[in-house]
A protein has these predicted regions:
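Single conserved hydrophobic/aromatic residue that forms the stacking wall/gate
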Residues: 175-184
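Short beta-strand micro-motifs within the conserved protein kinase catalytic domain, predominantly
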Residues: 59-66
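Conserved kinase catalytic-core helix
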Residues: 81-114
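An alpha-helical support segment within catalytic cores of ATP-dependent transferases
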Residues: 107-154, 164-165
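ATP-binding glycine-rich loop module of kinase domains
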Residues: 14-37
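Conserved short submotifs of the Hanks-type protein kinase catalytic core
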Residues: 67-78
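The N-lobe alphaC helix and its flanking beta3-alphaC-beta4 segment of protein kinase-like domains
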Residues: 36-47
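ATP-binding glycine-rich phosphate-binding loop
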Residues: 2-20
Length: 184
């Protein structure tokens, strides 16, 4: 394993900052990030890799200056959000493309990672700003939703889709995480 040298910061978030490092994108977690969260995220991203979806592949997990980091392939290109801003006349077509990509994501079955339904249940149960009647209503509605192990991105949008110069489309997993509370 080579020591990673961080280059230009390409993204900044509440719990992670992302840097370029040669042909890698390095997601550096804030100092208080538990090791378990970092390794679970790397595990989840690896499970998504196994589906065959175009996602940046994980190359390593390591400590950098006392902070945990996940290094993946650096995908050079523009986000679909940037392209849509540059070509507003083509937005309808890009939205159709997003729907197809979303359907492709949802067609993948993944086992061994936390289920969105379980995460939502925990979130609802932890809310102290709603009364027990509203909590019961929300949990009942959640229980009525289908049970399956299909993949869900968690924050799917044009800013999380990268299109390379040769029109290859990659799904950015920077926002994949086990709990909506952990969203960056």
């Amino acid at each position: 394993m080579n020591e990673i040298k961080l280059g230009k910061k390409i993204s900044e978030g509440k719990t992670v900052d992302v840097y370029e490092s040669g042909d890698l994108a390095v997601k550096v977690f804030k100092p208080d990030a538990p090791k378990t969260v970092v390794f679970y995220e790397a595990f989840m991203d690896s499970k998504v890799e196994e589906t065959g979806l175009n996602v940046p592949k994980i190359k390593e997990v390591e400590l950098i200056d006392g902070k945990w980091a996940i290094a993946t392939e650096l995908i050079k290109g523009k986000t679909l959000a940037q392209i849509m801003q540059e070509e507003p006349e083509n937005c309808d077509g890009y939205l159709d493309d997003m729907v197809e990509l979303q359907l492709e994501i949802h067609s993948k079955k993944v086992t061994g990672i936390s289920k969105l339904k379980d995460n939502l249940r925990a979130e609802i149960e932890s809310l102290d700003v709603i009364d027990h009647i509203k909590r019961y209503d929300l949990l009942t509605r959640l229980d009525s939703t289908p049970k399956h192990v299909k993949l869900c991105h968690g924050n799917f949008g044009p800013e999380n889709i990268v299109v390379t110069d040769d029109n290859k489309v990659y799904i950015c997993l920077l926002y994949t995480s086990p709990s909506p509370r952990d969203m960056r």
